[in-house]
Amino acid sequence: MKAVILAAGLGSRLRPITNEVPKCMVPVNGIRIIDKQIDNLLQNGVTEIFVVDGYKAEILAAHLNEIYPQVHIVSNPRYAETNNMYSLFLTAQYVKGEEFLLMNSDVYYDTNIIEGMLQGENQSKIACDRSGYIEESMKITLDGDKINDISKKITPEEH
């Protein structure tokens, strides 16, 4: 199994914390978010991990090369003018036609989430936190068990 972690974003909502480091390197409970994600992936048998960097790329690359030399770094030099879809596009040559996990690098999650995503027969899955509505978060609408829409613009009534 492969995984793509999108880590190119500016992290502007976390400033001044992200003035010096990319958002994924911010520690939560003493552990960098990116470290928790990579450790969880490795513990669950994910064999190839691709991290797309952008903002403060040199800092993230130095950290990954030191701690996780097996992780592949894909650079998005256009991170300031593009979005996550472009970062994902940059990994196409590595994951095209294969199953892979797609993750945003700024999401802190329970350790059992990856295990749950790898179980079962469904080819496409999405992990959602249904505990509340947060204006800035990505949200989904469902039609039965099918995803109907994914957007930050979904209203509380649609959520």
PLM regions with names:
Residues 1-19:
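N-terminal nucleotide-binding beta1-loop-alpha1 segment
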Residues 2-5, 31-99:
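Conserved N-terminal catalytic core of the sugar/cofactor nucleotidyltransferase
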Residues 7, 53, 104, 128-129:
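Short beta-strand/turn micro-motifs composed of small residues
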Residues 17-19, 38-39, 62-65, 113-116:
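Short amphipathic alpha-helical segments
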Residues 20-35:
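Short catalytic helix/loop segments, enriched in acidic residues and glycine
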Residues 98-108:
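Short beta-strand-to-loop acidic/aromatic patch adjacent to the donor-nucleotide binding site
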Residues 110-159:
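Conserved core of the sugar-phosphate nucleotidyltransferase
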